[in-house]
Every structure is written in structure tokens, then in C-alpha cells.
Amino acid sequence: MLLIKRARIVEAASEKIPALRESIGKYKEKNHILVYCGATTVRDYGYQEGVPTSEEIRQIDAVTDLLGNQMGFRVAQFTSKEDALTRSKLIKSFDQGEMIQALIAIRCLDEGVNIPSIDKAFILASSTNPKEYIQRRGRVLRLYPGKNYAQIYDFITLPIPLDKVKGYATEDISGFKGLAKRELIRMMDFAKIAQNPYEIDTLIRDIKNAYDIEDEELERESEEEWDD
């Protein structure tokens, strides 16, 4: 069961790349874009600050190829490989928006990097830890001249597509509900402060119905996440 669950999650996560293509296309002429990659979080076993995993490297390279080569964005990677001077130059160029439209990064929102000019963020590195994703969100929402709001696309991972959930036995679905609940909690938290919560309300309702998740379950799960 654990192997199946892992395979489902990996497969679902890989679908974030085509979803990114669909979402980011309308910003082809815009600047100050961050694409935040990553397969692990600071709570994961084996996490080392400044040392990306092979999965993270594969994702950031895939995103770089998509945006830079296939879609024609002016991009740069922002990872632990760059020294402090290089990072400073990248941020300056990103702020100016002439040479770099988009930074494709690993972990920078978790490791103290401050780039307040970001006003469009595509977060592929989902976290179910509220303290972690609130910190990431807060870094994107930093004040900057001419920046009145930020647009955040937070990509969720569901182990089973909504249109296929009903084809699974109840006992199989129960093994996947934990992830679905944690993703729902993050979605609901984002919706609370969004200017367009109505765009996510329907999806939240559909996920609840498909996975048979009650509001009381989400409340308990949320309290447990904050207590960890």
C-alpha cells in the first residue's frame, strides 16, 4: 500500500509541469515571476539545507527547459550552486526586469532569501506544514514600490484524480485521505485572505465530496498540524 501511495503521489506531482505551462502562459510579457520548485521540505527525513535532492534537481531542470527553451521566457535558476555575489546580481537583474523575467528556485523561500519584488509566484513545492507555507506566502507578499498585491498559484497534489475517486473501494480511499485533507487545509487557508476565494470554493467542495471529508475532520487535522 505504501509503495502504491508513493507511486500515486509521484505521478500526481509530475503533472504539475504541464499544469504550470497552462497557468503561466498569459504572463509571457510580464516580469517579477518566481517559480518555486522542490520535492522536499525542512520536515522531511534527510533534508539538508543547501543540498537539493535528485528529485528537486530534476524538477527545476524540467521547469527551466519548459520556460526558457519551450516558452521563450527569460529565466535564471536560483539555487545553492550560486554564491552570494551571483545571487545578488541575479536579484538586481530580476528587480530591473530587463534581463530576467522569472527566477526558478529551490528552497529560497524557506532559507531566508528576501526578494520583495516578486509579485507572481508559482509554488510547485507544496507544503502541508502551516508554519512553512505561511512563511513562503509571507515572503511573496512583502511590500515593494509599485506592488499593490501578489498573484500566487499554489499547486496541489491529489493521489487520485477527482473523476476517478469513486472507482476505488472505501478502504483504499481511506489510505489517501490524509494527503487530501492536508491539501484542503492549505487551500482553505489561502482562500481566507485571497481577493478571489470564489475561484477555489468549487474545487474545495469537489475534493471534500470526492474523498468524503467532513469539516470536523479538517478542523481536527488543522489543529494537529499547528501542534506539531
Describe each model-derived feature in a short phrase.
Residues 34, 55-111:
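Conserved helicase ATPase core of P-loop NTP-dependent helicases/translocases
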Residues 1-73:
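Interdomain linker/hinge connecting the two RecA-like lobes of the SF2 helicase core
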Residues 101-106, 110-127, 132-139, 149-155:
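A short beta-strand element within the Helicase C-terminal
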